[in-house]
Structures are given as C-alpha cells and as structure tokens.
Amino acid sequence: MADKTVKELADMVSKTASAVQQQLVDAGLPARAEGDLVTELEQEKLVTYLKQSHGQEEKRRISLKSKTTSTARVTGSSGKSKSVNVEVRKKKVFEKPDPEKMAEELAAREQAMIESQARAAKDAEDRAATKKKSEERQAATLAAMRASLGSSKKSDDKNDDISTSVVVKKGGKTTIEVKPKDQPKKKVTATKPKVETAVERKAREVREKEEARLREIETETRRTQAEEAQKRTLEQMRKMAGQYTDQPATEVRKDEPLAEGLVGDALEESFEKERREIKRGTSTTSARGRGRRKNQDEREIKNRKNGLRSSQSSQHKFEKPVEKIVYDVEISEQITVSDLAQRMAVKAREVTKLLMKMGEIARESDMIDQATASLIVEEMGHNPVPVSDTKVEDDLQDAVDERSSNVQTRPPVVTIMGHVDHGKTSLLDKIRETKVATGEAGGITQHIGAYHVKTARGVITFLDTPGHAAFSAMRSRGAQATDIVVLVVAADDGMMPQTEEAIDHARAAGTPLIVAINKMDKPSADPDRVLNELTAKEVVSEDWGGDTPMARISAKTGDGIDELLELISLQAELMELEAPLDGPAQGVVIESRLEKGRGPVVSVLVKKGTLKQGDLVLAGEYYGKVRAMTDEHGKRIQSAGPSIPVEILGLPETPAAGSEFLVLTDEKKAREVADFRTNRERERQLERQNAMRLESMFDQMEQGNVSYLNIVLKTDVRGSLEALLAALNELSTDEVKVRVISSGVGPISESDVTLAESSEAVLLGFNVRADATARRKSDSANMDIRYYSVIYGLIDDVKAAMSGMLAPEHREKILGVADVREVFRSSKFGAAAGCMVVEGTIYRNKPIRVLRNDQVIFTGQLQSLRRYKEDVNEVRTGMECGLAVRGYDVEAGDKIEVFEIQEFARTI
C-alpha cells in the first residue's frame, strides 16, 4: 500500500474528497487537503477506525490449514498387502497480540524488575553493613590486644632496658621489633638471630605467646563467621523447602539425620563452600565454579519440585541380612501350600520340592494337614504354631458382652411346618386377617416369611417354611431357630413324606410340637385316621393319653384358630422364655435377597438384645452397618427387641439363610472374623475339590459318553436358590449331568444373558424377571429366558431337557426264522439255499444272522429272496423260499434269523 493523496483515496472508495477528509479527522489524523499525501501507516489507522465504527474488530487470529496425502502398504489378516491412502491434516493458528495487553505485560515486567533490583540493592547493603560490623569488631579486638601488649613491654623495658613490639600486618605476617635502651631503632625478625642472648630468648618467648593468642583469636573469629553463615544458609533453605512441603514427595524418616534431608543437602554444600572461602580468606569463587554450582543447584531444585530426593540421601541400598530370620508360622488344621510358603517368606516351589522328598506330590493350591505342615516348617528352620480353626470364633464369643441384668420375658417364635398343599400359608393368612389391624392387613410381604401378631395372651412371632421336598434345609433351619413347631396335617390327606420329615426335624432340634389338623370343613375329613398315623410315628395326642397338644382347625372358615393360639400361649408360658433386653443383639438370618434400588436386603430374627439402626452387624462372611430397618409391614423402625423379625439394609452381600448374626463394636474384629470365615469357606471348597479329583479323572475318561446341561439360575431369595441347587444336583445321572454355570439372587441382568450365550446354557429365573437391557440382549441373541414361580415346573422342565439329551435305547427284535433244507448251486448267485419259514416273516432288506448248532457264525444281509423263481420282499410262516446270503456259503441244517434294531426314547 503506497502513499496516496486524499483525492486518490476518494476515487478508490468512490466517495467525495470532503467525506474522506472528514473520516481522517474522525480517525484522529490531522486535516489534509485534497492534494496532501496520506502515508501507509495513516491509511492502516483509517481502515482500522472504519472497521471498528462499523462493528468489525481487527482480525487478530489467522488460521492456516494444510493437508498432505501419502500412500502406505498395509498387510491384512490373510497375508496380502494393499495400499491405503493416508491423509494428514494440520492446522496452525497465529494470533496477533493485543497492544494494550502487551503494554500491561511490559509494565508489569518492568515493575517486577525494579522491585527485584531494589531487593538486590537492599541485600547488598545489608551484607556490606554486616561485613563492616564484623571488621570493626575484629579491629577492636586487635587494638585491645595491642594495648595489653604495650603495657607488658613497658614493664619489660624497666627490667631489661629492652623495648619489644609486635606488629601485625595485613596478610597474616608478624614482625617483632626489639629496641635496646638509648640505642638507635633496629628491626629484627624472630627467625634470623644467630646467637641467642637472654634478651632475645625473652623476646622469643613473648613473641610465641602473642602468636598463640593471635591464632586463638583468629580461630574464634572464623568460627563465629562460620556460625553466622550457617544460620543465614539454614534460614534461606528453610524458606526454599517450605515451598514444597505440600507436595507428596518422598517422606523423610523420623530417624533420618538433618544432613540427609532436603535442607541438609543444601546445608552441607553451603557449609563446605563457607569453609573453603574462610580458609582461602576470600568469599569469591571462580566463574567456572559458580556456573557449575549454579547448574547443580538448579538441577536439585528441579528434582525437589518433581518430588525427587537426592540419590545420595534417599536411594535405598539393599543389604543382605547376615543372620537367617526365623518366623513363628501359624498353621491351621488345613492350609494350602501357597499360604504356607507365604508365611515362611519362601517360594511355593521350595515347599513342593520338600513335599516330594517326603513322598507327597502336591500342587500350590492343594491342601495339606497340620501335621505335615508342621514338619515342613521345622525342616525349613522356622517355629510352627498350631492354631485351632475355632480359636477366632471362640474369641468372638468371648468378646460379645452379654449384659443379662435386664432379663425379660420374650414372645415365642412359632414355625409352621407340614406337607405341601396342607394349608400352612392359608392358616397364616387367616391368623393375619383376624389378628392384625385393618390398616396393616396388606403390609406383609411374601418373601420375609416372618411376622408377629398380638393376641389376648401376648405377642406371637410366626415363621413360614415351604413344604416342598427341595426345601428340606430351610425347614431344618426353621426348626433350629424356633421355640415351638406347629405341624399342619390335612384331615383329608393324612401323613405325607414332608410331614414325617418335619417331625424328625422337630425332634432333632428338641422343639415342642403342636399338631393342627386342618381342613376340618371338608366332607372327606377323617381326623381319626390322622391320629392313628401320627401315633404310628410316636406322636400321641393328649386326648389319647400322650403329651402332644392337638387342635382341629379350618383355615378356610377360621374354626379352631383361637384354640390353636391358646395352646401356643400356654406352651410358651410353660417354657418360660426369657432374653436380655439390653446389650448387643444376636439372632439368625431368616432370608436374604437382592432388590434393585435397595441392594442386599436381609431378613433377621432377633433372639437376644436390641438391634438398633447404625449398629455394626456381622452375619456369616459379611459385615456392615445397619443403614435402615423395616418391620414386616414395610414401616421404618429404629430398634427391634428379642423375637422380633426385621429387614435390615447395609450388608455388602447376601449372607446364607440360617447363618447367625451379632452386633460388634470393634470394626477391626468384625473384619478379622469375616476374613477368617471367607478363608475357611475357600479351604473347604478346596478340600471338596481334592476329594473329587479321583472322580473327576474317571469323568474325564468317560467325557465322550457324558452330556452336560449348562444352567444359569437366578432366584428371588437365598433360601430358594439353595433349595433349587440341591434339587438340580440330585437330577444328574451317569449320562447327563446338570452343571450350574452361575447362580445368584436378584433380577436377570445383561451379564447373565451374555454368560448363558457364551457357555450355551439355559437361563432360568425363579420368581424374578429380566430387566430391559437383558431382554434386548436375549432378543438379539435369539435366546429364550424361562420364568417359573413354582418349583415343580422348573424341575420338570429340566428333567425333560435332560431326557432329550439322553442317547436313545436300542432294542433288537427277531422278525422271522427259516430252516435251510437244501443247498444248490446257481450260476448267478453261487450257493443258494432252499428254506422253510418256521417262525415270523423273512424280509429281504433286513439284517440276518446265520446260526449253526444254535451259535451265531455270521451276520450280514440277504442277497436274494425268491419264491417260485420270482423276487419277493417277504415270505411268511409255513412257506418255502430260496435265498442267497451275500458273502457267505450256508449249509443244510443252518438257521437264518432275520432281525431289526429299534430305537426307544429314554426319560429320567
């Protein structure tokens, strides 16, 4: 852009010259005539003003884009290479700095430089003042010394007529002047006399004393200067180190001396530098030394900022111990080889080698007994410490503080047991309707399986147990956790297998039994038959002279329910049930499940103490604080006393149903016990695996003949899961085995569908449903998810699937028998036999056997079957025929037996 006149600018922008002149004035430029020149800088200023006036800012950022294209050779999975176009795009942005910001930054830098120079000048003045004070103190000390020396010389002159003076010159040289009385002055040095007179000896002694005093003063002065330098350096290094105290650098040990830390490194270097300067008598160093020391200091400061320590002070050097370390190795009753090696701080293969020398072959994961482990520990030079598996549990019981000072009567816990479909749940529903308030009637959930009701004689807690055969373990736990067992027997059905099992569980637990004969409203009810069957099981009614209370009830009409509750209350009074109200709570886990949005939900029954919200609960292998508590109606509560069922939230996982829970105050103790129980369960699983190793070897040998039905099982509660797992394991046969790949509590998730798809398993849900993500995943994978609410249907479907996997059964059926009467030769078939069909029918295309003297000598097929020179497909009993056996020559008197192989489907 060259210089132009105002007229030329007006022509370029198609405006009048007066308008351009006015714009120049508005832009802050001096007024110009039409013929005056406008420089390039003024033109740029005018353009900038016009852009700003029209709302456009100066473009300060410029973006440059570049694109390069190249070709690369890529080798594919098949080994062939192909060309691929590679395009690389780059973008660079250049931003023009803002003049105002640049001016501000420049002013800030100038201000900082001025302040830095002022601080440097002040520091120089302080150092000069300090140096001046030090020199003044030194001069005063030397003046005092000269004064004392002068007085001593005057006294010596009076005695010896000799004047001696000591002159200290700069640089450290000492000259002694000896002046005899009334003689001209003569300078004599202490090192040049040839003949030492008495006067000279006296002067030498005085000189030596003064030199010693001067050396002491000089040493004291240097020490004072060194201390001051150390103090200054220490203060500077502390200020520097304070900038990095917030960084998580290498932690300095408490027993580490100061010289090994951050400040110590700097102190050592600074002190050494001060010593060298004092020794040389100067405080300056060479330029090369200053540069090298500066670079080293910068590196050290950079390392400290990055959280690093000096290699000389922080690098750990391993020193091999001189003496062997002897450990006290705790050995439980069963321990794995790897755990034993870890406790002795050796590798597992050393333990396995020692076991091989002892004649035992074991892997790292194998279990060994306590005696063998003790021998290994002693052989390796350590001290074995046998530990009982129950020690931790015993210590836990000792740690539980049972304050039984406030003992009160507690409600009885009653378990309803009996055969399936005998009316247990109907009885509980009827009791709920008649004894629970109207507002609470619908608040009982099906899964908790426990609730308490108020009667005229007090509170009664009921537990419900399933009656199916698969739930034997749950019924056993119910009998153990209860005070009274109510056995429900249908009057029209009598004794059943689960009824007898419930009687056995009650006797094994030593629990009193009350019999409730249900369904008395049915016309087919026969209570006398029920009494006879119970008497056969040694359960004799009080009416018949026994000790077992019995009540005849109808869960449908409600008849006899009050009488049953009366019997329960009387039995509870006779038992005198008591429990401490205060102290840590103890009880049993009734059921546990996993709910979406709430996490693990555990139903517990308190047996002792009071359970409060916020208590630390240990249940089985898990522990946690109670975050929330609800009763059987779903209402939030803060505490629960003895014999009260509640649901708690706060445990990390669902504990096993039937496991005991207790409240602890020490979280460390709870963690220790939980870890111990987890390890014990793992050891038990390893024991079971070792016990089944031989069986698994045989299974592997026969693996070609064994089929597996893989199942992924999800249930609503933990008790149902345990019952179904036991029932499915019992279905396994020698040919088809049920293998549960995964099982758990809670809804079916996407991970369950993925696992079932990868393992080709059947996905089963018992009282649970799949979430939306799992349904979409199953639909895309074309996988069927089966839902069940009754255990019968699930077991029957699994049986049907196993039956379909069974190999069909092959049976042989004899269709007909023919006697060979004569053998003749044929040019076409060779040896042909004339036969008489004596039994059944002979078929042409069926397999045959040739019997000679009732022994099978050949098995094959017929080549030809004729009757009167005509080919036929079959010949019936009593008819003659001619036949030829393919690949074998028959003789007269042989028998031809025709048979077929039939397949029959097998079922479990």
Swiss-Prot record:
Gene3D superfamilies: P-loop containing nucleotide triphosphate hydrolases, Putative DNA-binding domain, N-terminal subdomain of bacterial translation initiation factor IF2, Translation factors, Translation initiation factor IF- 2, domain 3. Residues 464-467 are annotated as: G3. One of its GO terms (cellular component) is cytosol. The lineage of its organism: Bacteria, Pseudomonadati, Pseudomonadota, Gammaproteobacteria, Moraxellales. GO terms for molecular function: GTP binding; GTPase activity; translation initiation factor activity. This is Translation initiation factor IF-2. GTP binds at residues 418-425, 464-468, 518-521. It comes from Psychrobacter cryohalolentis (strain ATCC BAA-1226 / DSM 17306 / VKM B-2378 / K5). Pfam families: EF-G_D2, GTP_EFTU, IF-2, IF2_assoc, IF2_N. PANTHER family: TR-TYPE G DOMAIN-CONTAINING PROTEIN, TRANSLATION INITIATION FACTOR IF-2-RELATED. Residues 409-578 form the tr-type G domain. One of the essential components for the initiation of protein synthesis. Protects formylmethionyl-tRNA from spontaneous hydrolysis and promotes its binding to the 30S ribosomal subunits. Also involved in the hydrolysis of GTP during the formation of the 70S ribosomal complex. Residues 518-521 are annotated as: G4. Residues 65-84 have a biased composition (Polar residues). Residues 443-447 are annotated as: G2. Belongs to the TRAFAC class translation factor GTPase superfamily. Classic translation factor GTPase family. IF-2 subfamily. InterPro entries: DNA-bd_dom_put_sf (IPR009061), EF-G-like_DII (IPR053905), IF2_assoc_dom_bac (IPR013575), IF2_II (IPR044145), IF2_N (IPR006847), P-loop_NTPase (IPR027417), Small_GTP-bd (IPR005225), T_Tr_GTP-bd_dom (IPR000795). Residues 418-425 are annotated as: G1. It is found in: Cytoplasm. Residues 554-556 are annotated as: G5.
